[in-house]
Amino acid sequence: MPKPSRGPRMCSGPDHERLVLANMSASLFLNKKLRTTEARAKRLRPFAEKLVTLSKRGGLHSRRRALSILRNKAALHELFTNIAPLVEDRNGGYTRITKVGFRSGDGAPMALIELILEPVSARTRGTDTLPDTVTDTGPDSAPDPVPGSEPGSAAGDLPDADTAPADPGESSSNQRVIR
């Protein structure tokens, strides 16, 4: 007997769950946001994002497949004519889920799921980590000395491992212990 792979059903059965997800995604496409429970928002996200990806392909076949899932011509028109061109440059991640508190009646955690219609920011990788000026870091350039590492300074007073006393019973405050 087949079992649900994504945990327990949101509603009474698989057919009813598909209808609820279709109605919720139609409301999401028409209103651009939807306030629902956290569990329903998490189940709606992949369902709606697959429909947005389908609408980005365009074409009659994609439109008919989306209509067979959505069953709402107004939402289908909104999805294909208004939403798809806005998310054309975005590769996934078309929705955002924001937790908004708890429902007053039964204390269920509520969430706001909304479409991300802003254009993708044109960031270049690594520009925020590079310094403004680049210095010569070739093999001939020596690294800057670390402060306190000069001979005679406090950090340079430790004896080398070769010059440490050979007798283990002899203790010194500057003795380096090798383990």
UniProtKB/Swiss-Prot annotation:
Keywords: Ribonucleoprotein, Ribosomal protein. Residues 154-168 have a biased composition (Low complexity). Residues 170-179 have a biased composition (Polar residues). One of its GO terms (molecular function) is structural constituent of ribosome. InterPro entries: Ribosomal_bL17, Ribosomal_bL17_CS, Ribosomal_bL17_sf. GO terms for biological process: translation. Residues 123-179 are annotated as: Disordered. One of its GO terms (cellular component) is cytosolic large ribosomal subunit. Part of the 50S ribosomal subunit. Contacts protein L32. PANTHER family: LARGE RIBOSOMAL SUBUNIT PROTEIN BL17M, RIBOSOMAL PROTEIN L17. Belongs to the bacterial ribosomal protein bL17 family. This is Large ribosomal subunit protein bL17. It comes from Tropheryma whipplei (strain Twist). The lineage of its organism: Bacteria, Bacillati, Actinomycetota, Actinomycetes, Micrococcales. The gene is rplQ.
